[in-house]
């Protein structure tokens, strides 16, 4: 019994040496890990991912998930006059295209068809396989002319134009896109013992009920001097009725504007063009700038719709003279369109500063 006990017990000196060796191996492995040589079919280098995850967080490319994140959550202005100022033409820069696996709903998308003064196209056709962004609440369809001083239209802030699971640095003609960036999320490796138990298969009822999806609404515009310093944007109600847009506004404002013009018979009644102008005291930011982020709180969120009839102040005109009409000072009623939760949860990302200290790589959030 005693001798058996002695066989299981290491001498104190040998125990110290053995435990010291084990700790050295553990620390050596963590501090000087081999570069991750697992990235093959990717433009990222192994060393870049190695630095990104601080050496010990990524064990397989299956843990990397590329997602497209929209810029709307940053609070940028999404109306057409403001958005087009973020885009510009350049020559001699090759376009870049990268794929992403998942995205999120977009409140505002854009679709451009711009021609030069000589009738030639400003924007290239999309390459094979590039389709429009599939999840848009509002599609702002812009047709017009401009100088287009360059071969391709890029984002001035370096963002991507997100299409259907493809992100490009340039705008393609007649193809719906939204502004965004592509990020790589690192998913933790699942423990193997999670899969030991037989998974329970629950019956799933799938449906193609369209009410569970967003209704996409297309808003049309005419723009002149696209790409120039001073551009002019008109909201198109019908082929002969337009509204001059001279300041930022929400898409909900334009929807109500369109409904009010039609309901109150304010459309052009001849073949001439009728252009309305907004009263300076009208607030064009009714509703929400983006469906997850309310920009402004209004005291009368659910105003009676009967007051909309007073929204316009008719101006006597003759059929021969097409004069601009000015909207009155009444506010539009604020209504909120039905929204659904985003199908991909927005995940806040943070930059980390990594450094090598005492043989170990340490990462801290950037301030």
Curated annotation (Swiss-Prot):
GO terms for biological process: monoatomic ion transmembrane transport. Keywords: Cleavage on pair of basic residues, Disulfide bond, Glycoprotein, Ion channel, Ion transport, Secreted, Signal, Transport, Viral ion channel. Glycans are attached at residues 41, 205, 239, 258, 269. InterPro entries: GPC_FiloV (IPR014625), GPC_filovir-type_extra_dom (IPR002561). Residues 1-33 form the signal peptide. This is Pre-small/secreted glycoprotein. Belongs to the filoviruses glycoprotein family. One of its GO terms (molecular function) is channel activity. The record marks 325-326 as: Cleavage. It comes from the Viruses. Disulfide bonds join 109-136, 122-148. The gene is GP. Pfam families: Filo_glycop. GO terms for cellular component: extracellular region; host cell membrane.
């Amino acid at each position: 019994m005693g001798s058996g006990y002695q066989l299981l017990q290491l001498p104190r000196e040998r125990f110290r040496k053995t435990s010291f060796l084990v700790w050295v191996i553990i620390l050596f492995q963590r501090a000087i890990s081999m570069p991750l040589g697992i990235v093959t079919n990717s433009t990222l280098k192994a060393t870049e991912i190695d630095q990104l995850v601080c050496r010990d967080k990524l064990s397989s490319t299956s843990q990397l998930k590329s997602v497209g994140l929209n810029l709307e959550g940053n609070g940028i202005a999404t109306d057409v006059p403001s958005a087009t100022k973020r885009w510009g033409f350049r020559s001699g820069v090759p376009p870049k295209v990268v794929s992403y696996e998942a995205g999120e709903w977009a409140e505002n998308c854009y679709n451009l068809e711009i021609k030069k003064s000589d009738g030639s196209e400003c924007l290239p056709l999309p390459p094979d396989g590039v389709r429009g962004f599939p999840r848009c609440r509002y599609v702002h369809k812009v047709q017009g002319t401009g100088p287009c001083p360059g071969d391709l239209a890029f984002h001035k802030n370096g963002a991507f134009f997100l299409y259907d699971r493809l992100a490009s640095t340039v705008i393609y003609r007649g193809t719906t896109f939204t502004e965004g960036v592509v990020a790589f999320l690192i998913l933790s490796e699942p423990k193997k013992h999670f899969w030991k138990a037989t998974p329970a298969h629950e019956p799933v009822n799938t449906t193609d009920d369209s009410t569970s999806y967003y209704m996409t609404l297309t808003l049309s515009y005419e723009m002149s001097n696209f790409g120039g310093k001073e551009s002019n944007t008109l909201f198109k109600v019908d082929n002969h009725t337009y509204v001059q847009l001279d300041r930022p506004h929400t898409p909900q404002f334009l929807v109500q504007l369109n409904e009010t013009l039609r309901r109150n018979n304010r459309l052009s009644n001849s073949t001439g063009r009728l252009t309305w102008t907004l009263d300076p005291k009208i607030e064009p930011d009714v509703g929400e700038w983006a469906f997850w982020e309310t920009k402004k709180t209004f005291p009368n969120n659910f105003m009676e719709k009967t007051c909309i009839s007073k929204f316009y102040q008719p101006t006597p005109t003759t059929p021969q003279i097409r004069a601009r009409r000015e909207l009155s000072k009444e506010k539009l009623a604020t209504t909120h369109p039905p929204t659904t939760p985003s199908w991909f949860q927005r995940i806040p990302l943070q930059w980390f500063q990594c450094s090598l200290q005492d043989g170990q790589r340490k990462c801290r959030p950037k301030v």
